[in-house]
Regions:
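Internal alpha-helical transmembrane segments
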Residues: 1-29
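Alpha-helical transmembrane segments of integral membrane proteins
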Residues: 2-3, 136, 144-168, 184, ...
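Cytoplasmic juxtamembrane interface segments
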Residues: 3, 47, 53-82, 155-179, ...
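Residue-level signal for discrete positions within transmembrane alpha-helices
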Residues: 12, 134, 138, 174-177, ...
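Residue-level recognition of pore/gate-forming positions within transmembrane alpha-helices
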Residues: 12, 20, 43-45, 177, ...
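Hydrophobic alpha-helical transmembrane segments of membrane transport/permease proteins
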Residues: 18-100, 200-222
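Membrane-water interface segments at the C-terminal ends of transmembrane alpha-helices
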Residues: 22-31, 175-208, 236-242
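An internal, D/E-rich "acidic patch" concept
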Residues: 66, 79-82, 86-154
Length: 368
């Protein structure tokens, strides 16, 4: 196992390097940049994130047409006409764009190895402080969603396996598959319209993680307020998230039920409940429990972004989204580095969990 762990840890380095390199090249090739963002603010042509994404930025389009039609402009930045070139050079030095791309990339990697992510371009904070500030929101959302999905999926999968082929199995499979096919952000919008938009019911808060004056509440009231705000975001992610785990639990149980040791246990006169909970459950749950780290990372990656944006939860997903829109490169690459490193680490932990709970698995020899 030691050799396998060392090999996997060493494999993280080139994997992380490749992911960072590809994304760095894509970002460099993409139009726009932090200097152009600052120019748009300086000239008063900047718009908010929604306008840029929806394509309604008519001011920027007009500026681009003017830039392309003016043959005397030597600036390589859109909207920089009339701005002192010396000022642009100062901006390049301030943001580090006076150096070639490969030197900036190597310097960035060297800083990231020491977990020095620099300062945000447009926020008066260090990137590490920003990430640490937003991390509890994303972890809370991902962790509670994962726990609720496991709490629902495992009993449902066991019940489907016991009643395999029944009408309950058919209809429950239809429901979970349909729920899995609908994106979580559609559920989020539907829940807002129904339960917090004021159109039908106004039972839950529309945005945020806590109410104003949360610190002044009693300990129990703070817990209630916290889950009151998390109810709709978690529900929107849980509805479409338990299909895969439910079917995995069902298939794992069906595979174990048909094995010889179950037939032997029944032949000895053990009750069906004793057979299922005392023998089948322990073996069938190995693959389900071992997949918890990977499931948590998957939910954190795929569900957090849009859910945080829709419900205005100030977490890593919303931070990364704003960084991409505003071309805040330090926050963008730091978020990418953090999520990639977390994903690779949790994947290793998941594999090690398999080995711990099932000694038959040997990743060194690739045998079971």
């Amino acid at each position: 196992m030691t050799a396998y762990i060392i090999r996997r840890l060493l494999l993280i380095v080139p994997t992380l390097f490749g992911i960072m390199l590809i994304n760095f090249l894509v970002i460099q090739a993409a139009p726009g940049g932090p200097i152009e963002q600052l120019i748009s603010r300086y000239t008063g042509t900047g718009v908010d994130a929604t306008a840029r994404i929806s394509g309604s930025n008519q001011t920027e389009a007009a500026s681009n047409r003017q830039l392309s039609s003016d043959g005397n402009l030597s600036s390589k930045y859109r909207g920089a006409q009339g701005i002192d070139p010396a000022f642009l050079r100062e901006l390049e030095v301030m943001y580090g764009f006076d150096k070639p791309a490969h030197k900036r990339f190597l310097k960035m990697l060297g800083d990231y190895v020491r977990f020095d992510f620099g300062d945000s371009f447009f926020r008066d904070q260090r990137v590490v402080d920003l990430v640490l500030e937003k991390m509890p929101v994303s972890i809370s959302l991902g962790l509670w969603t994962t726990l609720f999905i496991y709490t629902i999926s495992i009993p449902l999968g066991i019940l489907k396996a016991v009643r395999d082929g029944s009408r309950f199995d058919f209809w429950s499979s239809s429901v979970v598959v349909v729920g899995n096919a609908i994106p979580s952000f559609l559920f989020a919008i539907l829940l807002i319209v129904l339960f917090s938009g004021g159109r039908y019911f106004d039972w839950f808060p529309l945005r945020g993680l806590t109410s104003p004056g949360w610190q002044e509440l009693s300990y129990f009231a703070r817990i209630v307020d916290y889950f009151w705000h998390l109810a709709l975001p978690i529900l929107s992610m849980v509805i479409g998230g338990f299909a895969a785990l439910t079917l995995l639990t069902k298939n794992s149980f069906l595979e174990e039920i048909n094995k010889q040791y179950v037939v032997t246990a029944r032949a000895k006169g053990l009750t069906e409940r004793h057979v299922l909970l005392g023998h089948v459950f322990r073996n069938a749950m190995l693959i389900v429990i071992a997949g918890f780290p990977s499931a948590f990372v998957g939910i954190l990656f795929t569900g957090a972004l849009l859910t945080e944006i829709i419900f205005s939860l100030d977490g890593l997903g919303l931070l990364g989204f704003e960084a991409v829109v505003n071309r805040d490169y330090p926050v963008m690459f730091a978020s990418l580095y953090f999520f990639t490193l977390l994903g690779l680490t949790m994947q290793l932990i998941g594999d090690l969990t398999y080995m711990v709970i099932d000694p038959r698995i040997d990743f060194d020899n690739r045998e079971v």
